[in-house]
Amino acid sequence: NIMISRSRDGEIIAKVCEKWGFKVVRGSKGKKGSAEATLQMINELKHDNYGAIMVDGPHGPAKVCKDGVVKIAKLSGKPIVPVFWYSPNPTFLKFPTWDKFRIPFFSTHLINLYGEPIYVDKNNTDEQDEQVRLKVEKALEELEKQAPQRYKEVFRFGIWKKKK
């Protein structure tokens, strides 16, 4: 399950994700659309389905984690697992969006980096939830810093070499 905006840009991304076999949960900035998508995502997580959310939301700013991901984790009882994918390869489909969203094109080599799970106590205060939100941001920043070096390490192992 991937939560994606109901915007025009989101429609393109949703179609790609569905073609790749992902279930898409659509939400909009308005309270009703956002609440419906949030409740649907919480329900999916409570039924042990996976969920993915771009933590900077549909309108940014880029790399600033919104509080919605913390609320979803808190209400579902599931941890937040920071994920960052990286490739220096320029062959990406680039979208003219505020966050410069990119989708890998054809045989792009990329790596996924995963951070430690971040748990949210259901009894947290608003201040504690804010600390969790900041922790998510910091974890993603750290993965982004590590990505170029980790990519080089993976590439050195020859994982993507063509078999003869």
Protein language model regions, located:
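Cofactor-binding loop segments of dinucleotide-utilizing enzymes, especially the Rossmann-like FAD-
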Residues: 5-7, 56, 85-88
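Catalytic-site beta-strand/loop segments enriched in glycine and acidic/polar residues
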Residues: 40-76
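A cross-family acyltransferase "interaction/gating" segment
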Residues: 66-125
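Catalytic core of membrane glycerolipid acyltransferases/transacylases, capturing the structured
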Residues: 1-33, 76, 91-92
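Membrane-interfacial terminal anchoring regions of lipid-handling membrane enzymes
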Residues: 46, 130-164
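Structural motif
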Residues: 33-39
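Short, hinge-like loop/turn segments at secondary-structure boundaries
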Residues: 18-21, 43-44, 97-104
